[in-house]
Design a protein with these regions (language model features):
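Short, flexible loop motifs at catalytic/binding sites
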Residues: 1-202
Length: 202
């Protein structure tokens, strides 16, 4: 929460979406008039995340719920003035807006040219808001912008704080589970999606 720039390299099915949705919902409820962008490699994925956030909101006790001003597939606005937008990661997604949190989901799966255009277009928006948070979460997918940002964060060449989780930290995942998963998929797929290794190039 204290970090302005965070990058997370996480395995599949490790609860990353649930944790992020919970954090963003908490932030919107307890901070009035904030703008949050949920951006994913596909608009449908971002809308799905927003849908899950809306479901989490519905399951809150009534005393925690804010009044809802507008509620649709692409955005949510609360009575306290906080807004959450869901869109695909593109150069035009948040251009011209002012955001308190920009959450980039599965950033490694955003095509390299789009990822670069996004940052060159959006970084002025990020840097002008002195407290704007950028949270990048992804499973690796080749040597691309996510790879560069991650390795630079590890080497302290940028401002991102790197966070990673190993698949074995997820309850119920052991060597038996690993062997079964590899048998049902492939060694390479396991290395990328669960060991979170950067393989090949894109």
């Amino acid at each position: 929460h204290k970090n302005r720039f965070t990058i997370c390299k996480l395995p599949r099915q490790s609860g990353k979406s649930t944790i992020m949705i919970s954090y963003l919902l908490h932030y919107a409820l307890f901070n009035p008039s904030v703008n949050i962008a949920i951006l994913a490699n596909k608009a449908a994925t971002a809308r799905d995340l927003l849908g899950r956030l809306q479901l989490a909101y519905e399951n809150l006790p009534k005393w925690l719920q804010q009044g809802v001003m507008s509620w649709n597939k692409g955005s949510l606005e609360l009575e306290n003035g906080s807004k959450i937008l869901a869109s695909s990661t593109s150069a035009s997604a948040v251009r011209g807006g002012s955001y308190n949190i920009i959450f980039l989901d599965e950033f490694a799966y955003v095509p390299s040219n789009v990822a670069e255009q996004f940052f060159s277009s959006v970084y002025p928006t990020i840097s002008s808001g002195k407290s704007t948070k950028v949270i990048i979460v992804s499973t690796p997918h080749g040597m691309n912008m996510f790879y560069k940002l991650w390795t630079d964060a590890e080497e302290k060449r940028n401002s991102y704080i790197p966070i990673e989780v190993h698949w074995s930290e997820v309850p119920g995942r052991d060597e038996k589970w690993k062997k079964e998963t590899i048998a049902n998929t492939s060694e390479q797929q396991f290395q990328t999606e669960f060991e979170c290794e950067f393989l090949g190039s894109v």
